[in-house]
């Protein structure tokens, strides 16, 4: 069901008031709507829900009551539900399917969807509407994500981004740390995380007389991110894209490193994934920590529910995502941007006015604080600027933004370039390791229940031959997407 946007005026952000991006015409860029004599109505489709939708709602109506009113532009925003629902609706509109809605002026899109729409000739290039100075205000990699042909085009405009962090049930961690001497710094590397996970499994196993009933320490929301970013830190690019054509770049050595630090700990019970999201697993106490998007922070539970009658309150500790030891740190760049449909000049110009306004520091910070996402300009990606905004930060949101902003400002950011079939290829990568790990752990648990030792139950899954068979099957699956 589509949902109409709500309304609220926001306080001005005094510290960044001087940075007004594109609300007046600048030399070198196509001028944007300077007070249209004819009203322009814009439709925006998103997949936002919950806090993120509420935060977006407030800003849209602020625009309508201020700059939009001045320039005769009205924005109407609709949530299409989920990411998949939005992609389906946009594609149906673009293809003119019977019963489909009219194409929106602006819609949220990930790179692969936007690339497909661009190949259909549906997207406007926003580059002519930005001066070099205006472009320089944005985090560069956020803009280049929408430059499909490396010509400097802007086919996806960034409005909010995210990266990954480690979210920890600090309450129960402290019990483990007090008993074993474990430290937060042990979780700074992937190798340290796995070693600590082994210690946590053994420590929890020793709490009962039942053998092999230890608990997993961690989980991951996106295995594809782990593999893509891990490979990048280890010197390889799994999806190497040039001119829209992908060449797979994953050596057996790097694949083995990735395997040893997720599949192996998973089948040993040191890592786990059972709920739809790892925050669900935190809630039932099956894991103590997870690596996931900073935008997932609002879903971190405040209680662990061990049963219908047993629960306890927990506190969140936010830490940087673990990186591979001895490697340059790479952080994932994720989050959909806004694509503008190729319609009339007046509508495209009005769309740019709205997007520039939305990404002014005071407005972008307001959205980030309300939703857990990150601002997209250099000026707004700064904790001093966020504090100066005057907007209230909860303790958790303060820590989330601090760690995420630090990752963006200090680490290399990486996201895959768009290519035909990219969404399906990423899905195959995502499930290639997680599905086999889940199935094999279930087999191990059956064998343990039948009386086998852990060594006996796991042995067949830890051989070189077993890894090599998986690696070859992955290469075969991904090779069909090569250009």
Where are these regions (language model features)?
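Short, low-complexity disordered leader/linker segments with a strong preference
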Residues: 1-42, 455, 461, 465-483
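Extracytoplasmic "Venus flytrap"/periplasmic binding protein-like
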Residues: 68-141, 175-176, 288-289, 307-310
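Extracytoplasmic/periplasmic substrate-recognition and gating elements
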Residues: 95, 267-268, 307-378
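Hinge/lid segment of periplasmic solute-binding proteins
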Residues: 108-165, 209-210, 230-231, 313-322
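Short, solvent-exposed loop/beta-turn-alpha elements that line the ligand-binding surface or hinge
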Residues: 127-138, 182-186, 211, 216-218, ...
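Extracytoplasmic/periplasmic solute-binding protein
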Residues: 149-164, 191-247, 287
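Glycine-centered hinge/linker elements that transmit conformational signals in sensory
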Residues: 194-201, 241-275, 321
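Conserved C-terminal helix/tail region of periplasmic/extracytoplasmic solute-binding proteins
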Residues: 405-483
């Amino acid at each position: 069901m589509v949902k109409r946007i709500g309304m609220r005026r926001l306080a001005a952000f005094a510290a960044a008031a001087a940075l007004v991006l594109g609300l007046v015409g600048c030399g070198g860029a196509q001028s944007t709507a300077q007070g249209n004599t004819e009203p322009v109505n814009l439709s925006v489709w998103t997949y936002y829900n919950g806090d993120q939708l509420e935060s977006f709602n407030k800003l849209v109506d602020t625009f309508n009551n201020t700059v939009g009113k001045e320039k005769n532009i009205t924005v109407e925003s609709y949530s299409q539900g989920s990411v998949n629902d939005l992609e389906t609706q946009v594609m149906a509109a673009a293809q003119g399917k019977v019963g489909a809605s009219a194409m929106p002026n602006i819609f949220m899109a990930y790179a692969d969807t936007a690339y497909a729409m661009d190949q259909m000739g549906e997207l406007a290039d926003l580059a002519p509407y930005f001066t070099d100075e205006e472009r320089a205000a944005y985090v560069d990699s956020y803009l280049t994500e929408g430059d499909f042909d490396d010509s400097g085009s802007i086919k996806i405009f960034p409005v909010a981004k995210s990266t990954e962090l480690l979210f920890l049930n600090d309450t129960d961690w402290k019990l483990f740390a007090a008993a074993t001497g474990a430290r937060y710094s042990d979780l700074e590397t992937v190798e340290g995380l796995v070693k600590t996970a082994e210690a946590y499994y053994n420590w929890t196993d020793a709490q009962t007389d039942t053998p092999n009933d230890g608990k997993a320490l961690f989980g991951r929301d996106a295995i594809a991110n782990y593999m893509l970013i891990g490979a990048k830190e280890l010197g390889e690019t799994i999806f190497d894209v040039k001119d829209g054509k992908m060449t797979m770049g994953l050596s057996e050595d790097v694949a083995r490193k990735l395997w040893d630090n997720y599949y192996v700990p998973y089948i040993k019970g040191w890592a786990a994934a059972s709920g739809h999201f790892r925050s669900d697993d935190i809630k039932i106490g099956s894991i103590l920590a997870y690596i996931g998007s900073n935008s997932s922070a609002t879903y971190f539970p405040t209680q662990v529910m061990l049963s219908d009658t047993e629960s306890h309150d927990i506190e969140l500790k936010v830490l940087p995502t673990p990186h591979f030891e001895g490697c340059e740190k790479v952080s994932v760049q994720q989050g959909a941007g806004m694509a503008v449909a190729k319609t009339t000049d007046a509508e495209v110009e009005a769309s740019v006015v709205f997007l520039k306004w939305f990404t002014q520091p005071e407005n972008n910070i307001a959205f980030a604080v309300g939703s857990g996402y990150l601002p997209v300009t250099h000026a707004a990606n700064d904790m001093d600027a966020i504090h100066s905004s005057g907007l209230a930060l909860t303790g958790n949101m303060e820590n989330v933004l601090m760690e995420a902003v630090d990752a963006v400002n200090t680490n290399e950011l990486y996201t895959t370039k768009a290519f035909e079939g990219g969404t399906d290829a990423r899905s195959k990568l995502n499930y290639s390791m997680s599905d086999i790990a889940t199935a094999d752990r279930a087999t191990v648990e059956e064998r343990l229940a039948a009386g086998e030792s852990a060594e006996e139950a796991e042995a067949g899954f830890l051989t070189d031959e077993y890894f090599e068979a998986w690696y070859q099957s992955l290469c075969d699956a991904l090779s069909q997407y090569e250009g």
